[in-house]
Amino acid sequence: MKLEKILNNIDYKLIKGSLDTEVSGLYYDSRKVTNGSAFICLSGTQVDGHDYIKSAIEKGATTIIIEKDVEVPEDVTVVKLPNTRKNLSLLAINYFDNPASKLTMIGITGTKGKTTTSWMIKNILEEDGHKTGVIGTMGVFIGNTHYDTVNTTPESFDIQKYLKEMVDDKVEYAIMEVSSQALKVGRVEGLSFDYGVFTNLTKDHIGEGEHENMEDYIYSKSLLFQKCKHGILNIDDIHYEDMIKNSTCDIHTFGKNKEANLLIDNIKLLRKEHFIGLELNTKGIIEDTFLVNTPGEFSAYNASSAILTTYLIGCKVENIKKALSKVAVKGRVEIVPVSSKYSVIIDYAHNGLSMQSILETMRAYNPKRIVSLFGCGGNRSKERRYDMGEISGRLADFTIVTEDNSRYEDINDIMNDIEIGLKKTSGKYIKIPSRKDAIKYAIDNAKEGDIILLLGKGHETYREINGVREHLDEREIIKDILNNK
């Protein structure tokens, strides 16, 4: 592809070389550069791509795209942009021939519920006969292909690459979790969404390398509703008005507020063998009853956002109902079939807020006991450890403290920090360093009516120790324990 085509509709300055230069590929990682490609220099908080120009040229880059004035060898084409990171998305859109324009784009933002909502929408669309692709916290899913990702919303170039693959694979609907950070730094610059979904907003992601304050966090979230045609929003959320203040889309709402287009009329919690979920009655645009295969009042909100979105798309209500009755999201309040006498749930809850939410949610189902099993990540905030220890000690009947991704810290030091929080309560607990042994202890000591919560790992199937990821899948551990009982 000619460089000129890649720069279409972008403000640039040709420093030297030719716009007729053929570009065989676009790269922002100098280690991946191939012969005849263009290297885009991104200025990050820790790494500056301008420092790797020499390495990129040695690997065969014939075009360098910069935002700073730097020395570049004579025989290389150089283009200067005002902001390479924001323009990376536009460059990639041009390079991949704007794949989003060939898809129906659904973007989901919110502090909690993005992953569950995206999978609910995916399941409904597939039940209605459509092919989907998903980009989010659990990775990228295109048909039967799965790619792991580092961020909830990948780098802008990678987003376009995945969208192009979806187009090639005849996908109709692309469902994307859109983080506030992605909106802030421009990873979705130039992307238009057909549907934008807002789940909720609570204080999170405030600090170094994220958002400087709550105002910045709120504003960043609201940007999605300047990028979509239809906005589907939680009208009950305290920040609903902030989300729509500068919106340019049609607004559709869900919630308990009588003004909601889809009114949450009644929620009935249900627990039976291998099922912990709810019955949701709606009024307004849809008057019906939905059985939802995920527990808690927050699941009613996630389900309502999915119902309203897919209804606006044109899915049949009977298919929406069918999909929600069997939806299962890996690592998100995931019920593992074990026994008719007690329940085991795997969930990604890995901070105080999410832990409190799931513990309070499960208490509403009146279990005999709630057993909370968790650890905390190494080389991370100690405050989180104290917080989670105290919350588990206060809200669970019994706590099992174990390992998580200890990284470069001693597991026992992390458990001791969690114990500090636990000791602020009267909660009973035990410390078991091996997660496998901890799960076995929980199952061996389960009582009728118990709900055992395995928290923190969720969809992850590894543990990280001293920089090495080792395979660890809680589902496999549970299966082995039950097979050997």
Feature roles, as predicted:
Residues 7-10, 86-231, 235, 239-250, ...:
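Phosphate-binding loop of NTP-binding sites
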Residues 44-46, 70, 180-181, 202-204, ...:
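Short glycine-rich anion-binding loops that position phosphate/pyrophosphate groups of nucleotides
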